[in-house]
């Protein structure tokens, strides 16, 4: 018989994930169906989102190989029935206090930084780049981890060195760029552009650097269709684009600059977002989401 979730101690919770203690060496990482936008956790969940994020992470952990935090299969007996398919047994690590972001294309906060300074996180870039420009080479653009509700703050490589030391900072940069190079080639072969992604690492008891948290999911990455790609315009993406677009439209009646809570999402936006997440998983993995462990919503 599987344990119940309340038999584990709740250790921490974020915008999307919750962490529970299994024993001294293992944790239960649970991905919820919560969705966040513009630093708000919305009141309307996206059915199956937690399962998609978990399936995508497991897929890419297997593709990448190497050292990661997984400590059990997706149907591990230690996973409670109520979170089966959206929870993983992972090793307990000393997490590195840096968001390891890598960008192969210019968009989002990177574009804002570039337009203001000609650089992103202190990395100088050529003149004349526009929205969605491919960068000459992928760049490591780290961020400090923010508290729930706050923005992650872009930092320079020198600031990473100040936080964790030269040796670990260099290893973080090298490992992040390596993951991006392999994952972007993998995605490109499937007609998908991996514009950027955010990784997290931890240290095990032996001081070894371990890839952790989620990896290459639609929440932590920008995926664009290769077909129709054109620099100079905003690209359609395989994530919560429908949610962001609706929240900033007149239909929502919500003012992003206000301190008010965003309204509930209409059913058609929920359905479209769920379908987009599943499409991302199936196109990139080549697998059917129907075959993933756990009950479908």
From Swiss-Prot:
<keyword id="KW-0547">Nucleotide-binding</keyword>
<dbReference type="GO" id="GO:0005737">
    <property type="term" value="C:cytoplasm"/>
</dbReference>
<dbReference type="GO" id="GO:0004639">
    <property type="term" value="F:phosphoribosylaminoimidazolesuccinocarboxamide synthase activity"/>
</dbReference>
<protein>
    <recommendedName>
        <fullName>Phosphoribosylaminoimidazole-succinocarboxamide synthase</fullName>
        <ecNumber>6.3.2.6</ecNumber>
    </recommendedName>
</protein>
<dbReference type="GO" id="GO:0006189">
    <property type="term" value="P:'de novo' IMP biosynthetic process"/>
</dbReference>
<dbReference type="Pfam" id="PF01259">
    <property type="entry name" value="SAICAR_synt"/>
</dbReference>
<keyword id="KW-0436">Ligase</keyword>
<comment type="pathway">
    <text>Purine metabolism; IMP biosynthesis via de novo pathway; 5-amino-1-(5-phospho-D-ribosyl)imidazole-4-carboxamide from 5-amino-1-(5-phospho-D-ribosyl)imidazole-4-carboxylate: step 1/2.</text>
</comment>
<keyword id="KW-0067">ATP-binding</keyword>
<dbReference type="InterPro" id="IPR028923">
    <property type="entry name" value="SAICAR_synt/ADE2_N"/>
</dbReference>
<dbReference type="InterPro" id="IPR018236">
    <property type="entry name" value="SAICAR_synthetase_CS"/>
</dbReference>
<dbReference type="GO" id="GO:0005524">
    <property type="term" value="F:ATP binding"/>
</dbReference>
<comment type="similarity">
    <text>Belongs to the SAICAR synthetase family.</text>
</comment>
<dbReference type="InterPro" id="IPR001636">
    <property type="entry name" value="SAICAR_synth"/>
</dbReference>
<keyword id="KW-0658">Purine biosynthesis</keyword>
């Amino acid at each position: 018989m599987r344990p119940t979730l309340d038999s584990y101690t709740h250790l921490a919770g974020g915008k999307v994930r919750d962490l529970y203690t299994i024993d001294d060496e293992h944790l239960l990482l649970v991905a919820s169906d919560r969705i966040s936008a513009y630093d708000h956790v919305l009141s309307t969940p996206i059915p199956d989102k937690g399962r998609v994020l978990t399936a995508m992470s497991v897929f890419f952990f297997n593709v990448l190989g190497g050292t990661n935090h997984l400590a059990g299969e997706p149907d591990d007996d230690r996973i409670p029935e109520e979170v089966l398919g959206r929870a993983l047994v992972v090793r307990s690590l000393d997490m590195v206090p840096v968001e390891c972001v890598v960008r192969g294309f210019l968009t989002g906060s990177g574009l804002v930084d570039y337009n203001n300074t000609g650089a992103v996180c202190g990395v100088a870039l050529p003149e004349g780049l526009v929205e969605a420009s491919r960068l000459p080479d992928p760049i490591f653009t780290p961020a400090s981890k923010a508290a729930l509700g706050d923005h992650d703050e872009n930092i320079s490589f020198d600031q990473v060195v100040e936080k964790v030391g030269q040796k670990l900072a260099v290893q973080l940069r090298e490992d992040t760029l390596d993951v991006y190079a392999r994952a972007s080639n993998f995605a490109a072969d499937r007609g998908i552009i991996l514009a950027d992604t955010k990784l997290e690492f931890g240290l095990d008891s032996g001081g070894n650097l371990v890839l952790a948290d989620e990896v290459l999911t639609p929440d932590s990455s920008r995926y664009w269709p290769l077909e129709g790609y054109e620099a100079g315009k905003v690209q359609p993406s395989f994530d919560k684009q429908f949610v962001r677009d609706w929240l900033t439209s007149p239909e929502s009646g919500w003012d992003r600059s206000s301190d008010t809570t965003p309204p509930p999402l209409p059913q058609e936006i929920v359905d479209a977002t769920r379908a987009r997440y599943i499409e991302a998983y199936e196109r990139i993995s080549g697998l059917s989401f129907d075959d993933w462990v756990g009950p479908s919503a």
